[in-house]
């Protein structure tokens, strides 16, 4: 930061990662728009996203049976999951799902051991995995990374929702 200060380059904090709602996170597009001289376009784009999001959210708001979902995966000896008050938890709820960590008070990531996730997520209907996998991702690749993954109901029923960050610029 010192070099940037010496060159009189202003630093602007980017706090999007602190957002606890998907729309709050998406609204940061307005800040990006300001920096590149496209504030009006960014505001229009956000308004469209907000309208579509709220329309889809309303469609599932009265759903009685909500599919269960768990999230994350093991990295070394730790399973990383979004906290129960994170924007991912809100996204799952707004999409009509019952997130396995919904009662957790954390807004960021939570570190868990395999046994705890297994006990809570074993029978979940869906499993969300997001990582940067080189190559073509498959159930076999997921199983190869940890053979115990094949025991989860969502794996057995082929209901893993996968986002490859190598292909999709989510962040």
Residue ranges and their predicted role:
Residues 1-28, 99-106, 110-120, 140-146:
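Internal alpha/beta domain cores that form substrate/cofactor-binding pockets in large enzymes
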Residues 4, 26-33, 42-46, 50-53, ...:
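Extracytoplasmic/secreted envelope proteins and their assembly/folding machinery
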Residues 7-12, 32, 63-69, 95-98, ...:
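Loop/turn elements at helix/coil->beta-strand transitions in domains of secreted/extracellular proteins
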Residues 70-74, 114, 124-135, 139:
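Loop/turn-rich, solvent-exposed surfaces of beta-rich toroidal or solenoidal domains
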Residues 88-108, 128-131, 162:
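His/Asp/Glu-enriched short active-site or ligand-binding loop at hydrolase and phosphoryl-transfer sites
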């Amino acid at each position: 930061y010192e070099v940037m200060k010496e060159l009189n380059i202003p630093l602007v904090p980017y706090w999007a990662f602190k957002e606890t709602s998907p729309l709050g996170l998406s609204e940061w597009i307005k800040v990006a728009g300001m920096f590149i001289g496209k504030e009006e376009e960014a505001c229009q784009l956000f308004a469209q996203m907000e309208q579509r999001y709220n329309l889809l959210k309303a469609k599932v708001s009265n759903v009685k049976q909500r599919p269960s979902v768990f999230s994350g995966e093991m990295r070394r000896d730790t399973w990383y999951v979004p906290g129960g008050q994170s924007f991912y938890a809100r996204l799952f709820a707004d999409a009509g799902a019952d997130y396995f960590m919904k009662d957790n008070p954390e807004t960021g990531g939570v570190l868990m051991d395999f046994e705890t996730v297994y006990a809570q997520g074993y029978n979940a209907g869906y499993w969300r995995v997001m990582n940067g996998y080189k190559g073509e991702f498959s159930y076999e690749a997921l199983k190869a990374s940890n053979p115990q993954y094949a025991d989860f109901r969502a794996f057995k029923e082929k209901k893993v929702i996968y986002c490859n960050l190598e292909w999709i610029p989510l962040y």
